[in-house]
């Protein structure tokens, strides 16, 4: 779908409101029923005509009357048989629908479990970094950091051991702005992408969008220009934005986009460009996971520059450099901008820290990315110096505090407020408790939502942060609304995207759903589900393969008779103990394991998929599987050390990262084996390891079946 200059006008015909679609479906169903009833009436009336004509010929004799009535009587419909057939068809349909729904839920559970397990790993890794930073600070006080700084990782971490940029550090900020100035970058003559000039206007933004549609890359000079201009606007805004719909009489809220540029185009095409009478709120997580994160970011920031009173951006948990290292945004920048990605990355860290953290609509609706906790207070959010939190994953350090106790108390309270509003999730249970599934933030129940809304005089809490199958979902007695705008989030056809429009003085919600895919209309629900299910099972098998050795040991312990098989129930208990993914393993067993002919046992010895790294044969299985299991963490470590975004790390950096990974996983890795693996990955033997080659070197292979 296009979203060029002409798409600024709203198109009411494309407003796919949920209520309208439901009414249309009901009307269509009633019309079909009336049509069937008319056919039945016509059939019965024609039968009556035949009966009357045949009876007029039966007055000649009683015998002929009886015989003719039996011969000429048309077969009358049998209501009982018709009803039974209809009931049987309904049962078949409902069973089929129930099976599809069960498969969909199991698939969804796999995707979410793997996603949240990755987020847990990321937060654990950052906790580990925090411990290292603390140790560095202690060593620094003793004057013994020289050895630590020789380590590539220690050198990278030294940047994060310093406090975040503050207004009082004017020279530091000034130098950063000078180093990232667009005037430092020249435009090559061969550049054929979109061009921009200040002041920006909607036609320029429209041309930029059209260029992005055909995969043209915006020149880094223009990227830096947009970031600098957007930074000025965000810096002047309060931590909590407040907007009024008295003029527009409506407001549109969009959830996570995660680099899905096609979804952003659909939103602008269906709903029009932001304007005074068509304001927008984009509720965080603009980047990561999708392949066009920088394009999404440039369009949103450009729209803010054009009309800052018509579009409001809230910060999400992925507007964070540490998250970007793991989930793809830094990799995307390195691929598209090579060496020039370094100043862009440095400036983005600062710009993200200036994004507002929440928005209030007419003192009635509270909009925040993640959610709330029992400690969340708007008055505290208003006063938070948000720019101190370049990463929300750790509390900032302020050297200006008089005592360490005062420093800890003040910063931790502010940090907890920030962490909760960006990482929390609603639950049906009452109360508030730590969000252990994600590893950060809180779970909050309906009572917490009700208390927060009543305390602040709000009617509704709108948040994002969670992928929903339909693109949105109400919870907590319709007082908490989740909106997620990235369609096909896990896989093509996995979910719809949606946005919500609050219209009128009563601000009634109207939902617009969509799916940015050209193929989903041509395939059936069963076919789409099959594709998504296949993708989920493939990822789950890869995850299980990374636990192969641990699983086999556990299976052998439980297999007292050494038969090479286990009952499905025992097998599922073993898998859950080792992986901790909290999945319906009994239902998933036929898809991820080999079963006996009667389907009662899992033949665990026939699991032949093992992890392999590089081409070396002298491998220690425990080391290889540990590296494979934590390959995302290893990639994060590499990108953390790759300060110049060259995409390469030295052998020393590789060995250092693996040793750090061993400390992080509390399973020390032997240097000899790490060196063998490193040599096998260094295909051109230049002493450097390319990150892309490293990730390609991780693979699953089928081992020979032992007889």
From Swiss-Prot:
Catalytic function, reaction form: O-phospho-L-seryl-[protein] + H2O = L-seryl-[protein] + phosphate; O-phospho-L-threonyl-[protein] + H2O = L-threonyl-[protein] + phosphate
Domain spans labelled IQ: 81-103
InterPro entries associated with the record: Calcineurin-like_PHP_ApaH (IPR004843), EF-hand-dom_pair (IPR011992), EF_Hand_1_Ca_BS (IPR018247), EF_hand_dom (IPR002048), Metallo-depent_PP-like (IPR029052), PPP_dom (IPR013235), PPP_phosphatase (IPR051134), Ser/Thr-Pase_EF-hand_contain (IPR012008)
GO biological process: one example: detection of stimulus involved in sensory perception
A GO cellular-component term linked to this record: dendrite
Cofactor section: Mn(2+)
Lipid-modified sites (S-palmitoyl cysteine): 3
Active-site positions on this chain: 318 (proton donor)
Intracellular or extracellular location(s): Cell membrane; Perikaryon; Cell projection, Dendrite; Cell projection, Axon
Family in the record: Belongs to the PPP phosphatase family.
Name of the protein this chain belongs to: Serine/threonine-protein phosphatase with EF-hands pef-1
